[in-house]
Amino acid sequence: MNKIYSIKYSAATGGLIAVSELAKKVTCKTNRKISAALLSLAVISYTNIIYAANMDISKAWARDYLDLAQNKGVFQPGSTHVKIKLKDGTDFSFPALPVPDFSSATANGAATSIGGAYAVTVAHNAKNKSSANYQTYGSTQYTQINRMTTGNDFSIQRLNKYVVETRGADTSFNYNENNQNIIDRYGVDVGNGKKEIIGFRVGSGNTTFSGIKTSQTYQADLLSASLFHITNLRANTVGGNKVEYENDSYFTNLTTNGDSGSGVYVFDNKEDKWVLLGTTHGIIGNGKTQKTYVTPFDSKTTNELKQLFIQNVNIDNNTATIGGGKITIGNTTQDIEKNKNDQNKDLVFSGGGKISLKENLDLGYGGFIFDKNKKYTVSAEGNNNVTFKGAGIDIGKGSTVDWNIKYASNDALHKIGEGSLNVI
């Protein structure tokens, strides 16, 4: 009997595949078990690149920008009172905050996982499909299959599978508070009774260095980190309000072309955790100093897309029989629904009980979601040798799912959630 936490099963290899070591928040429980001058940052030809500088290595070492983004060295998630040696031998102290976990950033930095099969980026990344339509977490590539965008350059994406390599960034930042409340909740004491909101960004973009002569290169999987302080919570720019920030003067990593969509994080003092403020939209600057603009996370649009992929199924400790495109519980039968794009939805089970498959079930981009603190059994009706294929399985905290179904030969079972999956 297998107990799986966040892992995937490959029918091709006939075994469990461990998630990447980059997945800092994932554990496994198994025995086998602004103006016209505002520039969006989509990748363009090198002849049109505005900013030749990225990492300022006149004071800090290049490795520190890279190590922070990849949570290596002294930058382990949760580490506090972190210091680095500058080139002149003096110490640079980072803010008195725990180091963020950046595993929610896709390998090229252009999008951020927010859990399940969802990720966020900026809408204008659609012009460059390689930047956000295909996302790699750990060693697994995911594909965008649906999205919603806003006029404020926000984009929420549905991916083809549940992302197992990370739990995703927390999206509880409350942009609807007034400015003072936001500063009080997310600010850091910088002395003289003053608070500033300090945060981090992780992206790729055109990698260059100030202080030395190098050619420019766009290396999509070369992630580096920025340290910044917010200067304007409601900068009125093209499309709507953006958050404006400036880079730290010592640990300076300017935003460049290719950084569009990269995640921006601030610390929630009330909940004692890092949260996603939004995604990188654009820049204004002269090559030495710059202001970066961030599109705030849009919970309303995110929930609208999620609703397109939800079909609620209340079993209530009974048996749900699935076959012929229908779900039958007692004397009640409902169709397995699809959204307006003819895509299968997630079947969201509640109440505990048994799920019996009469035939092979291919949910396409939909998966199984189980509520908290319940017991479920998934098996074939009779002795049928049936298979399951879909986006994955999401098991709520405190729930246990006994799974006695084979996997389709061309699929991998992605399991997420804090509950237990027992593969029989």
Task: Give the residues covered by each predicted segment.
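Bacterial Sec-dependent N-terminal signal peptides
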Residues: 1-38, 46-51
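Acidic glycine-/aspartate-rich tracts in secreted/extracellular proteins
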Residues: 23-24, 124-127, 160-165, 204-208, ...
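C-terminal subregion of chymotrypsin/trypsin-like serine protease catalytic domains
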Residues: 53-84, 111, 115, 119, ...
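Conserved catalytic-core segment of clan PA serine endopeptidases
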Residues: 56-65, 120, 127-191
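Catalytic histidine site
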Residues: 80, 85-139
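Chymotrypsin/trypsin-fold serine protease catalytic domain
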Residues: 154-258
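Acidic Gly/Asp/Thr-rich repetitive segments characteristic of extracellular carbohydrate-active
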Residues: 317-348
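Extracellular, surface-exposed repeat architectures
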Residues: 351-424
